[in-house]
Amino acid sequence: MPPDSVHFNGSVNLPGTEAVMREISSRVPRGVRRMTDGETGERYYWIMFQVQKFAAMADFQAAGTRELPGVDLPPMPLLRLADGVAAKNVRWPDLGYAAAYTDSYQVFRRLQDDGTIPAGVRFQMQYPTPVAPIAGTFVPEDTEGLVASYQAALFADLDRALASLPHEQVAVQWDVAVEFAMLEGGFGFDPVPLGQITPGLARCADQIPGDVPVGMHLCYGDAGHQHFKQPESLALQVQVANAVTAAARRPVNWFSFTVPQAQRDNDYFAPLATLRTGPQTELYFALVPYYPASQPAGTTAQQAAHIDTHLGKSLAGSRDWGICTECGMGRVQAGDVPTLLDLHRTILDTHEVNR
């Protein structure tokens, strides 16, 4: 089955929410089930605005810097709890997500009311997992306690957003990136077992009410517009999807998978045969290349064929699936965003004849 739908993983390098939604709606007129606000403004570089908030807090103090091996970025600030401060007593500021999404939803509602955004498309909110802004930002001895403390603040922010927005019109995506760095030993982390990661991801899924769809972006990072490592296959991503599906008390409605744009080897996609998500779980694969001019002709068709072959062997068997980019489009040059959006439509149109 060729791809039939499109997913946007979050950030889009355009001037603001309305520009993002209008460009997506005009350039990708079909296949969009959820509309991102582009994570514009202070959210443009994912969790960096959270780290900036932490650095200004009296409850923390500087502890040097931390290198990010494998990416072309300057050292990141490293923090620790200030003397006499316990993690459970940290006074977290307004994290900013609920306010941003409440504002963006008003734009979404207006554009859907006037027909720019099709009826039935949901407003998508993206949140980092609680681990993401904490692990790597704080010294290891403070991390566990701070993840629990920050989780309470992040979930409270999410609850405020959900309380202010109509559940029948929204969806939530959790961005699972730092966990993959921890599993793979990237960004200088010591590798951890999957069992250490799964409970936290299941908590994230279960935090979303049952009447709101929830998804997970399985991500290998985009710091400096590059992955912390090139995944060797879909094996680990499939393992994470299976583990979260089994551990969560509610269904996970979609997963988006990282596929490097040059990757066309059968072995990369073979682990899909072991996928144990249900038939109603939407699956999206990064077949929209950031650099289309450098991708050999026929790559997308080969990737699609491998996906179909191995999904056909999985527990739920052959099913419809969709496309996305490897991460968001926040690090893409603004002038290239329209081209990438057009490419989403082109891939759907090109493969439609095979449906």
Regions found by a protein language model. Give the residues of each.
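Acidic, His- and aromatic-enriched active-site or binding-groove loops in soluble protein domains
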Residues: 59-60, 144-155, 189-208, 234-245
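Catalytic-face loop-and-helix region of soluble metabolic enzyme cores
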Residues: 246-355
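A contiguous, surface-oriented mixed alpha/beta subdomain in the mid-to-C-terminal portion of proteins
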Residues: 200-284
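N-terminal basic, low-complexity leaders that serve as flexible interaction/assembly modules and, when applicable
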Residues: 1-72, 349-350
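Active-site beta-loop-alpha junctions enriched in small/polar residues
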Residues: 11, 128-132, 175-179, 219-223, ...
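Structural preference for beta-strand elements that scaffold enzyme active sites
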Residues: 2-9, 31-35, 120-126, 169-173, ...
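Active-site-proximal, glycine-rich beta->alpha crossover segments in alpha/beta enzymes
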Residues: 72-166, 171-196
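Acidic (Asp/Glu)-rich catalytic clusters
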Residues: 25-26, 108-122, 162-169, 199-211, ...
